[in-house]
């Protein structure tokens, strides 16, 4: 038995749980309808409207007003979406949180190969949040006898970076020790 076989365990292998693609427009009407159409074309799934959870007078939004749209992708749909979206952006190690999840933004929806600029619609940006887990994370979400995940089984940012680089063949920019401490000199 080789050394890699003894350290590999299928329950420790990271997996893609879900990908949430979100467009915040800030208002309802035609703008929001356009955003929903674009999301549906890019993600291949019907978008769900998101509403303001509380009033934000600086944006002119009241509680309950529709302000955006989102799509949650799981399984093969999430995998294929990331294969299209990750080559369009540069991902840094800093974008990974302490549990291995990461987010990135796409400034213009027209960067996707399936999208073309339409002056009637304009240009929309979108946010993508990727949630990674390991098998066994369900014990934290179940209703009965829920338990925390032990620290030795939690997904770390370095595990997540390694998984994304191997699974999607993208290069994630590393952060040097100098810039990690906040110093740029």
UniProtKB/Swiss-Prot annotation:
GO terms for cellular component: ribonucleoprotein complex; ribosome. Pfam families: Ribosomal_L5, Ribosomal_L5_C. GO terms for biological process: translation. One of its GO terms (molecular function) is structural constituent of ribosome. InterPro entries: Ribosomal_uL5, Ribosomal_uL5_arc, Ribosomal_uL5_C, Ribosomal_uL5_dom_sf, Ribosomal_uL5_N. Keywords: Ribonucleoprotein, Ribosomal protein, RNA-binding, rRNA-binding, tRNA-binding. The keyword Repeat does not apply. Part of the 50S ribosomal subunit; contacts the 5S rRNA and probably tRNA. Forms a bridge to the 30S subunit in the 70S ribosome. This is one of the proteins that bind and probably mediate the attachment of the 5S RNA into the large ribosomal subunit, where it forms part of the central protuberance. In the 70S ribosome it contacts protein S13 of the 30S subunit (bridge B1b), connecting the 2 subunits; this bridge is implicated in subunit movement. May contact the P site tRNA; the 5S rRNA and some of its associated proteins might help stabilize positioning of ribosome-bound tRNAs. Belongs to the universal ribosomal protein uL5 family. PANTHER family: 60S RIBOSOMAL PROTEIN L11-RELATED. This is Large ribosomal subunit protein uL5. It comes from Haloquadratum walsbyi (strain DSM 16790 / HBSQ001). The lineage of its organism: Archaea, Methanobacteriati, Methanobacteriota, Stenosarchaea group, Halobacteria.
């Amino acid at each position: 038995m080789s050394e890699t076989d003894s350290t590999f365990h299928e329950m420790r292998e990271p997996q893609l749980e879900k990908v949430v693609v979100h467009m915040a427009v800030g208002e309802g009407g035609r703008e929001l309808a356009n955003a929903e159409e674009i999301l549906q074309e890019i993600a291949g799934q019907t978008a769900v409207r998101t509403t303001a959870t509380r009033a934000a007078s600086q944006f002119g939004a009241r509680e309950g007003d529709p302000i955006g749209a989102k799509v949650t992708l799981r399984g093969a749909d999430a995998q294929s979406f990331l294969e299209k979206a990750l080559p369009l952006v540069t991902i840094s190690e800093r974008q990974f949180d302490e549990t291995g999840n990461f987010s990135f933004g796409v400034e213009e929806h027209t960067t996707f190969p399936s999208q073309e600029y339409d002056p009637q619609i304009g240009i929309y940006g979108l946010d993508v949040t990727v949630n990674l887990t390991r098998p066994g994370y369900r014990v934290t979400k179940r209703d009965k006898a829920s338990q925390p995940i032990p620290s030795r089984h939690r997904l770390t940012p370095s595990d997540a970076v390694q998984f994304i680089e191997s699974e999607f063949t993208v290069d994630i920019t590393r952060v040097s020790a100098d810039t990690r401490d906040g110093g740029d000199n």
